[in-house]
From Swiss-Prot:
UniProt: IMP binding residues: 14-17, 39-42, 130, 144, 225, 240, 304
Enzyme class label: ligase
The protein's name: Adenylosuccinate synthetase
The species this protein was found in: Haemophilus influenzae (strain ATCC 51907 / DSM 11121 / KW20 / Rd)
Amino acids binding Mg(2+): 14, 41
GO cellular component, one term: cytoplasm
Pfam short name (any one): Adenylsucc_synt
Gene Ontology terms for molecular function: adenylosuccinate synthase activity; GTP binding; magnesium ion binding
Annotated positions binding GTP: 13-19, 41-43, 306, 332-334, 415-417
Length: 432
């Protein structure tokens, strides 16, 4: 019987989802992206070769897998063609194995221009977007003025819609933000030059998935960013513009929610965050700097340094609630090697003295929050590339077990290095 498994970030993104998607892809027929855009950098290291995929599902490196981009994904034609070109130059057949929903909103140059203009205007209060036009494209979707992949089939109608929407954007860019307008003809010409390639990959994603389920095929849904960046449930307004939680699978692909069998939450052995927003366990000392150095904590897309802190079970409990997480995959366990002690945040002390075990929702409610830590003995032994759980140091095993206890969710997969072979599968998600 076929299983449908969701892989998503249970923290603030950058948890190592790409590697785990790639690891489990040899079990499946389809890998599906259901939200986000090319703001998500999924890094894969296979036999020492590094690949960063931003828009195309990570399953593309497996020749027998079909990759689907669902309606919840915002698609930049330029970014898509660039990524396709990079993969095809390595002999990977993309357009024969990539299918796209016609309902995907398009990201066009005016979205990027607006993204940059807004962040510049906000100055120090900037949200910290990737500047790739993701938010403005989602805005257009909700406002029902956006252009979609399906609009590329009718080039005359597309040109007229583009003209109208550019008038709307250029008025704001010029008169409010005092920046240069976006050129209509260049935008139109650039999109039309690649329109036929994109429309050639359009398919009914919902029907494909439903048929696969009925035929007993395994399906893997690949999330982007992380739970605490969800537009509705994250640390608003320091969030992304899509639903990064498991509910986004149904709305972003058209796959019925009752058909999901297992949700794998990816967690680092510590926490990181990029950009602004609350981060209760953030470390500003030498320990934080050492975690960042050992973990090579720089964004795959932006290159920005990530903020680092101890493992936050309070935020994770909220992620468990929001996603119905079946099991965890813990990544970067080896980064904690060598520390005298390691800490787990088990509760928050609110400004009024109240002790809470679940993270607040809005960013404003995190102000003045203090972490309450449990301190455990660290381990000096090297766990890098260990693939036998029985060979892990006892203090490391104790740390893992304690995280399972304070969260109530089993750790089903352990990752001890960037390559997909440097992994221990303790419970198989597709057999759970």
């Amino acid at each position: 019987m076929g299983k449908s498994v969701v892989i998503l970030g249970a923290q603030w993104g950058d948890e190592g989802k790409g590697k785990i998607v790639d690891l489990l892809t040899d079990r499946v027929k389809y890998v599906v992206r259901y939200q986000g855009g090319h703001n998500a950098g999924h890094t894969l290291i296979i036999n020492g070769e590094k690949t960063v995929l931003r828009l195309i599902p990570s399953g593309m490196l497996h020749p027998n897998v079909t990759c689907l981009i669902g309606n919840g994904v915002v698609v930049s034609p330029e970014a898509l063609m660039k990524e396709m070109g990079e993969l095809e130059s390595r002999g990977i057949k993309v357009r024969e194995r990539l299918l796209i929903s016609e309902a995907c909103p398009l990201i066009l140059p005016y979205h990027v221009a607006m993204d940059h203009a807004r962040e510049a205007a906000l100055g120090k209060k900037a949200i910290g977007t990737t500047g790739r036009g993701i938010g403005p494209a989602y805005e257009d979707k909700v406002a029902r003025r956006g252009l979609r992949v399906g609009d590329l089939f009718n080039k005359e109608a597309f040109a007229e819609k583009l003209k109208n929407i550019l008038e709307y954007y250029n008025f704001q860019l010029v008169n409010y933000y005092k920046v240069e307008p976006v050129d209509y003809q260049k935008t139109l010409d650039d999109v039309m030059a690649i329109a036929d390639v994109i429309t050639g990959m359009v398919a009914d994603i919902t029907t494909i998935l439903d048929t696969a389920r009925k035929n007993g095929e395994h399906i893997l849904f690949e999330g982007a960013q992380g739970t605490m960046l969800d537009i509705d449930h994250g640390t608003y307004p320091y969030v992304t513009s899509s639903n990064t939680t498991a509910g986004g699978v149904a709305t972003g692909s058209g796959f019925g929610p009752r058909n999901l069998d297992y949700v794998l939450g990816i967690i680092k052995a510590y926490c990181t965050r990029v950009g602004g927003g609350p981060f209760t366990t953030e470390l500003f000392d030498d320990v934080g700097a050492e975690i960042a150095r050992k973990g090579n904590e720089f964004g795959a897309v932006t290159g920005r340094p990530r903020r680092c802190g101890w493992f936050d079970a309070v935020a994770i409990r909220r992620a468990i609630q929001l996603n119905s997480i079946s099991g965890f995959c813990m990544t970067k366990l080896d980064v904690l090697d060598g520390f005298d002690e390691v800490k787990i945040c088990v509760a928050y002390k609110m400004p009024n003295g109240e002790i809470v075990e679940y993270a607040p929702l809005a960013a404003k409610d995190w102000e003045g929050v203090e972490p309450i830590y449990e301190t455990l003995p660290g381990w000096k032994e090297n766990t890098f590339r260990i693939t036998d759980v029985n060979k892990l140091p006892q203090n490391c095993i104790n740390y893992i077990k304690r995280i399972e206890e304070v969260t109530g969710v089993p750790i089903d997969i352990l990752s001890t290095g960037p390559d997909r072979v440097e992994t221990m599968i303790l419970r198989e998600p597709f057999a759970a």
